[in-house]
Regions:
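Conserved C-terminal structural/oligomerization subdomain of aldehyde/semialdehyde dehydrogenase
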Residues: 103-182
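ALDH superfamily catalytic-core signature
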Residues: 1-120, 145-147
């Protein structure tokens, strides 16, 4: 086996992407083995003009958008005191993580999603979570989304994984993504 260390797998959903397929793909990946695979998505950054549709699609497919109180409760359990992923959440179902945080969600909840704004290391949702917990960011445009993804990769460990959901005819944007994700 070849290991490359921690990863923080940011995803960008460009305005040109197929939203239904993109959201389905993230859910499929994030729920396989309850997100324990290091290449599973840790955050989704949606461009502002599709953000509401992306958010609604996640909800429609059984994901739970954390309210402010729940968001803070989950923030408290994502990381261990040492600043690494909390082993108590790794590979646990979303409902168990919610219970650990102190609230209830339906047992069939697929992912706990925190709508956050900061990609700084001070934000627990900006870290690798190895569980069905996902950060959701809104970027005003594609360039901003790339900058956010660059920061997440930089803080999470170069040389791992990033994803882009985009129309295949957007060659320049795809090339820019490939050049900037290290």
């Amino acid at each position: 086996a070849l290991g490359v260390g921690p990863g923080n797998t940011p995803v960008i959903m460009d305005s040109s992407c197929d939203i239904q397929k993109s959201v389905y793909s993230v859910i499929h990946s994030k729920t396989f083995d309850n997100g324990m695979i290091c290449a599973s998505e840790q955050s989704v950054t949606a461009i502002a003009d599709i953000y509401d549709e992306v958010r609604a699609e996640f909800i429609k497919r059984g994901c739970h958008m954390l309210n402010k109180k729940e968001l803070d409760m989950v923030r408290e359990i994502i990381l261990s005191p040492a600043g690494t992923v909390n082993p108590k959440i790794v590979g646990q179902p979303a409902a168990e993580i919610a219970k650990l945080a102190g609230f209830e969600v339906p047992a069939d909840t697929k992912i706990l999603i925190g709508e956050v704004t900061s990609v700084d290391v001070s934000e627990p949702f900006a870290h690798e979570k190895l569980s069905p917990v996902l950060a959701l960011y809104k970027a005003k445009d594609y360039e901003t989304a790339l900058q956010m993804a660059e920061q997440l990769v930089s803080d999470g460990g170069y040389g791992h994984t990033s994803s882009l959901y985009i129309n295949v005819n957007e060659k320049e944007k795809m090339a820019e993504h490939a050049a900037r994700m290290k």
